[in-house]
Amino acid sequence: VTKEKLLKIIQAAKTSRRTSLALGDNKIKELPPEIGDLTNLMDLDMSRNELESIPTEIKNLKKLKRLGLNYQKFSYFPIEICSLEKLGELYLRGNKITKVPSEIGNLKNLTGLDLRGNRITHLPVELAQLNYLKLLFVDGNPLVDPPAEIVMEGSETVLNYIRTK
């Protein structure tokens, strides 16, 4: 998808007050700041593109409940996401993320977090603050803390480990 076509898609979604937008598998390298104009969005799926960063304007998507960013080119956790307080599900599988920021603790409504297949070695204690978090997928990371035997037990065991630290 060209930048011009992407801008047209965003403009059409804004005009029609779309609540859901799927732009996966489009070789998108950059998300334009205009994405922040889609203030009615509740579900945004950008999986399988070529994004390396997220524009700060993403913070304007105050109603966003689900964000799919699987299989991008992120080498860091896009901190801008941590201002999306209504976010319930976050998918960042298959990137090159090495660290989850402490600001993840701001996502109080998060129920599911998929971080499989990244390069994360430690999970932040702030994950323990996420009382609604039920599904935490972290396998396929070179985790040191929590240790591999905990990770192999699944979401509930990982969450219990983090919450009792």
Where do the model's predicted regions map?
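Gly/lys/ser-thr-rich phosphate-binding loops in alpha/beta enzymes
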Residues: 112-118, 126-128, 139
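A short beta-strand-loop micro-motif that forms or neighbors metal/cofactor-
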Residues: 108
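A contiguous binding-surface segment within folded domains or other stable secondary-structure elements
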Residues: 88-102, 111-112
